[in-house]
């Protein structure tokens, strides 16, 4: 015990250090008493304890420590020297006190820290506390934060430095410990109390939920400025003063002092400056100067990323600014100008005043660039110049600005004035002195008198701002000469201006802070938005637009921005964008109630929280109705959603009410300006309900609506974080499911990949299987966008889970992400000036990978690691490499900065240890994947050394090196490798391995490039040396690479490069070059073109086994079976077979059976399409060779590996031919059961069979041909259409085999060629076979010529390609062949053609030698054949072929141009009549007398025959004149295949089969929609329009009356027609080709359609009529104005003449004319006025004034007067000079009317009234009335005499006689022949019978009276018009002509008919010029071939000026036809 008490004797300081706790406790107690007693703070007593205070606070005994803390507190409070202990004591407190469980200890520790701050040691304390935040013990961290918070609360932000605290805040918010996060939240609230919104930017990236919580807390804070409650010792007096003031109630002065103490914190000051200059890409300054805009863009984008840092470190930015300035000033690409301006803005904002030194250089360039008018460029420039202004002063840039003020460009002047106005707002009276103001005012005063209003307005605004800043007194001297109006305007502008100088410090800073932030941070807080508005409010210019510009900022590349939400908002209005991006301030519940009550019914608000669920439901219904009726601008979204959230809110128990609630949320989000603040009110509730069975769907809908309003990235982040903060697994799984679907709908752009990956990992670790499944599904969707790199993030997962993820990824393999359907509603790609959208079709994943977080690993590449890699000991080197591999593997994705690693790895590529070399290569592969495209900066220093390794002697090392080079090239592209001399230097090395590998690599890569650097030429000399290398493999590789070098460099350059070679070498190399020139592939097409086909509907219809080809409405309707079923069939059948086969397996063969049990061909979705795409893009070798080389075989093997069973592939590529036979036998067996597989792999099967053609074994060849026969039979049954790719890689090799010496093989090949025509157009087969005639093998030539003859015999002349003329000339050449068999074959082929087409063949074959010609003539004589019928084989023997063509709708565009006319007729005859073609020909051979006299039994076919005959004769003549005869060989000789294809398709437009017509229209629409192809339609416009209105008439008369026909089909057809017409009339050059007659008939058809009441009754009828309206407007505006005006006048004339025409029709025609009149002022100069006046003259002649006045409506006369008045007004007296085309001006009143109008307009005094004029006119009328009657009758008789107008003339004569019964027409008949007189009398009798209802003729012809009434007669086209169904009589000459046409079409001779005059000779020449009917122009191109005939017609027409010939023929014709009709009538009645 004695020992224990010894310490009692010790002094206090020793007790305090004693090892016994009791001694220490006693010592501390004594010390405390001592400290309390010492009154003098400078007493020496204090110093004794100076070294002990740390021990006081760090005592190990908790009880003792408490006492020590008390003593330490007193010491610090009173001792003068206490400050010296700050560091160690506070450190002790942090580490040993803050971790104590006792609250008292912690409180004392905090008090000690605060006391140190009070004694002015705040910095040291803060430093130690911040160190404490890094401690691992959360208790310590919490206590440190609490201490800092208390210190800030008590001492204020002036004493406690906020910047270091704010810097660590985000890290604290990420802590796992809730206590730490809670304490961080409290300190953030405290900091916000002191600095307000300056805290927002640093916290933008914390978790959104935490940010939301902070926002809620911040809103609760009082708005009054905070005050410190505790003061430093030096401020104790101030504290005393403050207490005194508080006791006295305070005064203003105290408040003022206090206010001064609260510092104004600038957020900029709180940010860390970032150094960006060193981070610029090394090649930046080269790229910014590059010729390619894409490279310049890449350089600018790299700067754009760097300048997003809000605060930049000072440095030398001169070069960077200079480069950006150059882009702004000189770049022609506006997109890059805007991007460079954006970069300058970022630099100015980030550097602030440090940028001022560069301002003077940049400002003039920007001001000059304002000449650019594109809004996005102007906006970017405005933002840039505004940001730059804030870095300098107006004085500094005044000279530059004033210099631009005199620019002539008004846009520059306007924008400069606006900039001055904005600059003035930042000035004060002191910063805008008179010396500065004077020059600006002088310049602006010039602008207020500018001619451009926008310049004047901008100048007024600038002067008004100056007035507001410096006051009237300072400005008035400069405004002395300004007039009052302008002065008032300046003052008005001045009143509107809001200045910034009053709050300059704060707001300018805020402006700088927040302007860039929306682009740099994902979300912005409420106050930040408020500030942005405050700044931008007074500025109409760029500051207001800043948020809009930035909103679409983050996604940089064109393609990915499109699917996402962010990039697509560009076209929406700016305001809408701001509301989306800006979070509105949170409203209090009172404000919300007030706003809601203003828009909702009162009962609704009251019943929201009713206890009765029915009342709540009724309330919700009212709520919904109110929301539906609200306008977007009036809807208070936040107030409404807060009302919904009001009790019971989301805890609503009734599911019906809850469903309504959720639906209303969705409605509000869709209809209102929904902000993120509103979203935050409801999202928690939605997430809570998403898992609900009844309400889940509604919750998802609401979320989707919110995502559309607030953008998906933000919404998704909120929703997922909320879901995972809950513990409900159902909610979590459903949230992930919703997100999967949302990504597909919105696209992936802007999504925070990192955040989702962490959430998905959480979900994958969940115990609930539904959550895991949902997470895996989400990963699958993300995989679509991110690609294989996504898997890297989940490699650490459990194997079972990883296999599930892999399975999901496998499902998505090959699929492309769907196009976004949401978030792009009003999007138009206006921002992509260079068409960027198409530039990157499939590389969206690369852009998404850019979003993935990349790790900085440079700090891990330490010098130790580098020295390890370079160590002498290989084991240590290996360790170093292992470490590097581990670093890269852990990081997954890395940043390009990798320190000294490239140098270290480069050394290892030359390592003597080959294992290490391989390991290094593996690391380099890893590096390429991890670094991505950024690896390109390491190509020169690390990539080229990899190529050196290709020269290694070991195979495996070379293979690894090649794989590495490919991995790098995949990331970098080839440009970096080919630039410079590095590659040529490698090739120069005489290492055979290196040369082989390098040349092989280049041969693989060069074909895929569109362009290469010029440095490629440097490789050529070394390539030539490789061609002569000793090593054979090197030579072979060099030869293979030669065409690809030539592809890029061209033959000339390559040949020129041989100049330096030795003469012997040169000759050899040149020979090789010639050979390579033949095999040189074309350069790959640009991606835009490549992608345009799949994007549009124009891609060929490829067979898709997995899904029915429903893209085309026609082809899908003809598909007999849906493809999915087919796809399943083989699987089932093969399983069934295998089950049977496996009943009794022997053990030895079990494995083999299992291997062979499955299908032999595997259906790979889109596999064939991908292979075609690869071949087209030259990614693989094109299947084109003379003999198959190894690389082709290897390529085919590789392609087959994915879709052919392995065991079969082994057989197919076995070296033994017996295995080939075995493979073919298996393929034959599986042919029927695996149709889909065969079709899916058809291209590969055919290629493999071509290889078999080169085998010498006959049995294999026979087996292959047997298989081919079966294969093509199957394909034709399946109606499959061979693709171009399949055909071109197979047919040439098959054609070679036709020359085999064995007859049996030749016979089989011919049979196969014959069957191929069932699956591939004969016209496309023709060129392949024609190519075969050029062979050296005479047997092949002979067989090919025979096959050509068969094709012509079967399919007609149009099968000949490119034209019959060229084809026959080539065939005729072989008549002179040395081989007899070839000569005979050529002669037989031409004889075949002769048998089909007669003597025309001699014109086509051209000049033959006398010998050849005599041989041909002799052969023709010997054949003893008259020309027979055209090929009927295609109808009779090839029905399958016809179906195949029609069913493959998409192929018609490319499809066969052969045999067009015959196919068209065949289609018509098959659809319209069941009879065969021969029966149609017998129609004109009927013996009518025999039929008439035959009263016995009728032959079974007679009724059909007669009925057919009647229909065909008396229905309107479908094919007028001889103009649609079969397309003759002459036509093909003159026109290309394209023209004939278009003719064929146009002919199908008028088809009676709706599907055929729709197909044709679809194809034409494709052509019209592509600008580069639309020109192909030129010259076919009339033909196309005729076919179109023929179809319109057909629909009107036939289809609409057909009850069996689906009306939807008719609507579809109408839609196609109208869509086509609109496309056509949007192309002005094509629209102007339409002629008058065609336009007239087209307008007739369209107006008839608009008036069709049957259409209005259909469901979509109104839409059709609206579309027609639109089309009519297009026709009127875009057609040739003369033609359309003329057409309308003629149409009006016809409609007024026609008795059956409705008034409504005429009215619509007149409306069209009125529209044309309105257009006249703009179009008068382009109109042929002479022609129009001639048409008006004819109109006025037919309708004199009296007759017009008799019309029921006054509109016709008003229309005519208006038209003439407008013409007079526009042309003046010159109009009278345009009557040149009128022969007899007295025939109408036109000239008199024009004279009156001119006289009236020129009479200035107005003395002559209109009445006098009219009286004068009436006197003239009276004098001429008698003459008029005679003229009128003469006109009628001329019409009767004219064949065209005979019917109309008779009708008019009948009307005239009926009206004027006493009229004498004898004088007119007296001079005519007896025939003519009897014809007129009989015609009048017939009309009388018709009018009185005795419709004998009508009924006998089978034409319904209804059709008579509905059809409007068109007098100018009675014979030829399709719609002519009103029972007109038609002369037999018409039938004779039709017979002639039909005979010619069928290939019959017409020579016997030559004595009959042609149809046109039977027509009299019309007395007045009439508009040629549209159908007269059909096939107008044939006119050149009928020149001789036309001359004959002209002579006939001239001779027919008198009536005699016409009338005789006419009357005899009528007599004959009447007789014919009567006889037919008797036949019919006798059969009844």
Curated annotation (Swiss-Prot):
Instruction: Answer whether the UniProt record assigns the keyword Isomerase to this protein.
Output: no
> Which locations, inside or outside the cell, does it occupy?
Cytoplasm, Cytoskeleton, Microtubule organizing center, Centrosome; Cytoplasm, Cytoskeleton, Spindle pole; Cytoplasm, Cytoskeleton, Spindle; Chromosome, Centromere, Kinetochore
Family (UniProt): Belongs to the TOG/XMAP215 family.
Q: Domain of life, per the record?
A: Eukaryota
* Region named Interaction with TACC3: 1932-1957
> N6-acetyllysine: which positions carry it?
48
Q: Which residues form a coiled coil?
A: none
Q: Where is this region: TOG 5?
A: 1193-1428
Q: How does it assemble?
A: Interacts with TACC1. Interacts with SLAIN2 and SLAIN1. Interacts with HNRNPA2B1. Interacts with TACC3 independently of clathrin. Interacts with TACC3 and clathrin forming the TACC3/ch-TOG/clathrin complex located at spindle inter-microtubules bridges. Interacts with NDC80; indicative for an association with the NDC80 complex.
What this protein is called in its record is: Cytoskeleton-associated protein 5
The record's keywords, sorted A to Z, are: Acetylation, Cell cycle, Cell division, Centromere, Chromosome, Cytoplasm, Cytoskeleton, Kinetochore, Mitosis, Phosphoprotein, Repeat
**Domains: entry comment:** The TOG (tumor overexpressed gene) domains are arranged in a N-terminal pentameric array with each domain composed of six (for the most part non-canonical) HEAT repeats forming a oblong paddle-like structure. Intra-HEAT loops are positioned along a face of the TOG domain and bind to a single alpha/beta-tubulin heterodimer. The TOG domains in the array seem to be structurally and functionally polarized. Differential functions may range from microtubule (MT) lattice binding and/or free tubulin heterodimer binding to potentiating stable incorporation of tubulin into the MT lattice.
**Tissues expressed in:** Overexpressed in hepatomas and colonic tumors. Also expressed in skeletal muscle, brain, heart, placenta, lung, liver, kidney and pancreas. Expression is elevated in the brain; highly expressed in the Purkinje cell bodies of the cerebellum.
* Region feature Disordered, mapped onto this chain: 516-579, 811-851, 1077-1160, 1422-1443, 1801-1822, 1949-2032
Is this entry keyworded Cell cycle? yes
Against InterPro entries, the record matches this protein to:
ARM-like, ARM-type_fold, CLASP_N_dom, HEAT_type_2, TOG, XMAP215, XMAP215_CLASP_TOG
| A GO biological process held by the record | microtubule depolymerization
List residues modified as Phosphoserine.
816, 845, 1469, 1861
